[in-house]
């Protein structure tokens, strides 16, 4: 992927080069549009967003443009409490969280899914003020929103739109037609699902796929092909640009190389392995740990799941002076001692450890991980005080976050 992104034909071309000199680059963008139309089942794609959160903002701005074009004033956005945290921030940035709008939370049932009774109450309360709903699917607990289509139908009946947070797309890519599911806009993180390195501060990248009604409002340019030439065309009612030129173009090349390597069937296989890996690990660990949300243990997981300690294990930690709220972050540091990246802790469940193996690891590696997680629990049972001083084998025990934020070093001499 990096080899492809570093080819001189890509790296040496200025983003404002004439169309006739940019045919190779425009072809890549056009191909990505077509690939993600097939992957999502949606007829429109923009490649401009630089990250998942910016993709969300694109989606909500498209919603606003669509309603404005119909001379409708809709100032309410519905978001489940189980959604990704960026959804709430994005809705605020789009104007729904201030004086001109309102973010309304949807409660979850015992399995972590959207509580339909609560949705019905919100629909009754806000009616045609609802611009749309944002739902992460599968949700952050790794559970598929089985009533998604019914939710979409209710929102569409009001004239609202449906945004699906596609950050967990690696669980369903190639398996589900999002257009048939009722999705109007969805982002895909290229820096997570589609081979771009995840973490380390970026740079991220994304695409946004949309339903037919939102295509005229897409940002940036659509790349059209007439059989001979690739041409950038600005949509009729475009909401403008969210970034200069073509986004993180080198990431588009990396993603394109990955898609070509996978092929259509490989995309489906990638998702299948991600789900299989998560279910295999969950089956290995569910007897030793409790599963969150409480009451959802029997629900099949997709690509990830959330573990926590059992009641008696929390009691043992409290006996040595460690509060429940501090347990998950401390356990995460023990993962570092065992040579694994620390999991996401205390979110979306305050006492949770989020486990997401993805599609990248062999069964042997999954088994090694499961053994380590079981060993961590055994260590906690036998020596609960070990959590207080974790991690034990890293070069830095604890990051001084306050000092790091206040005493910022923006340049470092190379002659030290």
What role is predicted for each listed range?
Residues 24, 54-227, 237, 322, ...:
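Conserved PLP-enzyme active-site core in the AAT-like
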Residues 110, 142, 246, 268-272:
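A short glycine-/small-residue-rich loop at the edge of a beta-strand within enzyme catalytic domains
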Residues 1-44, 49, 58-61, 116, ...:
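Non-catalytic terminal extensions of PLP-dependent enzymes
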Residues 243-254:
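PLP-dependent aminotransferase class I/II
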Residues 66, 105, 144, 163, ...:
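Aromatic side chains
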């Amino acid at each position: 992927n990096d080899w492809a992104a570093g080819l001189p034909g890509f790296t040496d071309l200025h983003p404002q080069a004439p169309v006739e000199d940019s045919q190779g680059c425009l072809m890549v963008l056009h191909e990505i549009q077509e690939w993600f139309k097939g992957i999502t089942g949606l007829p429109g794609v923009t490649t401009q967003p630089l990250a998942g959160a910016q993709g969300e903002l694109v989606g909500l701005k498209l919603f606003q443009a669509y309603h404005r074009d119909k001379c409708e004033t809709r100032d309410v956005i519905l978001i489940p409490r189980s959604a990704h945290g960026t959804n709430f921030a994005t809705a605020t940035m789009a104007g729904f969280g201030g004086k001109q709008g309102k973010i309304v939370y949807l409660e979850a049932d015992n399995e972590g899914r959207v509580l339909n009774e609560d949705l019905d109450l919100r629909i009754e309360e806000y009616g045609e003020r609802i611009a749309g709903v944002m739902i992460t699917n599968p949700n952050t607990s790794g559970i598929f929103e089985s009533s998604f289509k019914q939710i979409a139908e209710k929102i569409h009946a009001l004239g609202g739109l449906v945004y699906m947070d596609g950050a967990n797309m690696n669980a369903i890519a190639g398996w589900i037609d999002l257009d048939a599911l009722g999705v109007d806009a969805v982002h895909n993180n290229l820096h997570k699902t589609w081979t771009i390195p995840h973490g380390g501060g970026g740079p991220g990248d994304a695409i946004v796929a949309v339903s037919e009604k939102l295509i005229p409002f897409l940002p940036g340019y659509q790349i059209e092909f007439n059989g001979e030439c690739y041409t950038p065309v600005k949509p009729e009612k475009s909401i403008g640009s969210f970034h200069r030129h073509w986004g993180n173009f080198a990431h588009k090349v990396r993603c394109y190389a990955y898609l070509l390597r996978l092929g259509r069937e490989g995309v489906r296989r990638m998702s299948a392995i991600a789900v299989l890996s998560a279910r295999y690990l969950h089956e290995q660990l569910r007897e030793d740990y409790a599963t969150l949300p409480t009451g959802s243990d029997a629900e099949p997981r997709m690509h990830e799941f959330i573990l926590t300690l059992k009641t008696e294990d929390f009691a043992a930690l409290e006996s040595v002076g460690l509060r429940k709220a501090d347990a998950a972050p401390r356990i995460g540091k023990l993962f570092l001692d065992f040579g694994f990246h620390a999991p996401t802790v205390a979110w979306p469940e305050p006492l949770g450890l989020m486990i997401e193996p993805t599609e990248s690891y062999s069964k042997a590696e999954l088994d090694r991980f499961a053994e380590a997680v079981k060993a961590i629990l055994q260590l906690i049972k036998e020596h609960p005080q070990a959590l207080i001083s974790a991690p034990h084998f890293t070069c830095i025990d604890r990051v001084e976050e306050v000092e790091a934020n206040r005493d910022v070093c923006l340049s470092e001499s190379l002659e030290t």
